[in-house]
């Protein structure tokens, strides 16, 4: 007799707190994909039923709620986390109970858990390309500003190493602000930037305080044509928070931008807006959250079980036609082959893509084999 019982999955995305904007978009991307799978008949006739908890942007709550999902809700698979501090809070729980986390966010690399599938960009899929683009087009003096937690520190270290590969590459300053930063926190940062006069600013500020940095930059009269902010974490959702025009001229790197003009992306955006409206802004985190659900569904369809030991042989090496292009989970490190892109923000709150990969770049979370100028990660100007 066929099993038609529901498949419960856990969702750990904050809808309150400092990272609520980006995680709400990831939550909606996840729910969108679950809807698509269920409307197509589910997984072997079984409906996916999400159990969502709001960790309120608190790493401690992610840990508590991950354990609740496992012990009380009996789930085997969860999707979630944006900040590295929240992912690291969850890792001991999923490893202790041998459960699976799909993590849909770029991060600093230098990690490989057998209980995680990483669908966001590794450093060789964004940092290298961004560093090369900025130094070729703006100059080799960088000022680093970030939020005060692990990802910005590690990402800034990587950017510093990349800049220093150039003979004249130089880090001229580095500052950090609280996750719940206010406008006051950026006054000293802006004053220091005025004093140091870098060629570009590399921002790893995350969450709802991102808009404050860009507004402070604009209020200071800085010009993005000569000293832009470059970022891996400022995407369409953050531009929408700032208001149109505030982020224009600044540069970001990501595998996905809404402006990708492929039939798959255009169709996905249209269906998403029809289902959920326009209050949530799709971005790279949204797209990774979306396609990882489909990859889970395909793997479970083959395995017949959501137990990690049954899923993993089918997940590793799996491919999927995502809005960014055809992605693949690398069997050697549980990370995903993605399509790096560089975008410059425009007045409409979107990104004009100025560089993009012609093929998927294999993830190298430990940056073992890559450096500036490496042909395997280089980008081309779109035709």
Regions found by a protein language model. Name each.
Residues 115-219, 263:
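Extracellular/periplasmic Venus flytrap/periplasmic-binding protein
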Residues 217-290, 368, 378-382:
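Extracellular/periplasmic periplasmic-binding protein-like sensory domains
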């Amino acid at each position: 007799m066929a099993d038609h019982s529901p498949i419960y999955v856990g969702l750990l995305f904050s809808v309150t707190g400092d990272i609520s904007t980006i995680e709400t978009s990831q939550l909606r991307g996840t729910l969108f994909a679950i809807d698509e799978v269920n409307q197509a008949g589910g997984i072997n006739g079984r409906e996916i039923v999400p159990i969502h908890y709001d960790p309120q942007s608190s790493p401690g709550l992610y840990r508590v709620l991950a354990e609740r999902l496992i012990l009380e809700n009996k789930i085997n698979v969860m999707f979630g986390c944006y900040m590295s501090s929240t992912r690291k809070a969850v890792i001991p729980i999923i490893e202790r109970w041998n459960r699976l986390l799909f993590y849909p966010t770029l991060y600093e690399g230098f990690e490989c858990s057998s209980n995680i599938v990483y669908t966001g960009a590794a450093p060789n899929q964004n940092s290298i390309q961004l560093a090369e683009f900025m130094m070729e087009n703006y100059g080799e003096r960088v000022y680093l500003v970030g939020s005060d937690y692990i990802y910005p520190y590690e990402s800034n270290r990587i950017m510093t190493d990349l800049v220093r590969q150039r003979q004249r590459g130089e880090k001229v300053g580095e500052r950090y602000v609280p996750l719940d930063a206010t406008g006051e926190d950026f006054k000293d940062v802006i004053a220091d930037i005025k004093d140091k006069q870098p060629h570009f600013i590399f921002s790893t500020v995350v969450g709802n305080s991102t808009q404050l940095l860009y507004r402070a930059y604009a209020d200071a009269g800085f010009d993005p044509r000569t000293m832009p902010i470059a970022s891996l974490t400022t995407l369409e959702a953050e531009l929408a928070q700032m208001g149109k025009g505030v982020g224009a001229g600044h540069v970001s790197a990501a595998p996905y931008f809404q402006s990708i003009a492929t039939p798959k992306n255009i169709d996905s955006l249209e269906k998403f807006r029809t289902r959920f409206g326009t209050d949530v802004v799709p971005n790279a985190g949204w797209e990774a959250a979306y396609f990882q659900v489909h990859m889970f569904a395909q793997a479970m369809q083959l395995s017949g079980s959501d137990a990690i030991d049954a899923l993993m042989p089918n997940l590793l090496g799996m491919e999927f036609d995502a809005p960014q292009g055809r992605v693949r989970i690398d069997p050697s490190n549980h990370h995903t082959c993605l399509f790096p892109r560089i975008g410059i923000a425009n007045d409409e709150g979107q990104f004009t893509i100025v560089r993009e990969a012609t093929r998927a770049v294999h993830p190298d979370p430990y940056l073992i084999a890559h450096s500036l100028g490496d042909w395997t990660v280089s980008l081309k100007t779109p035709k």
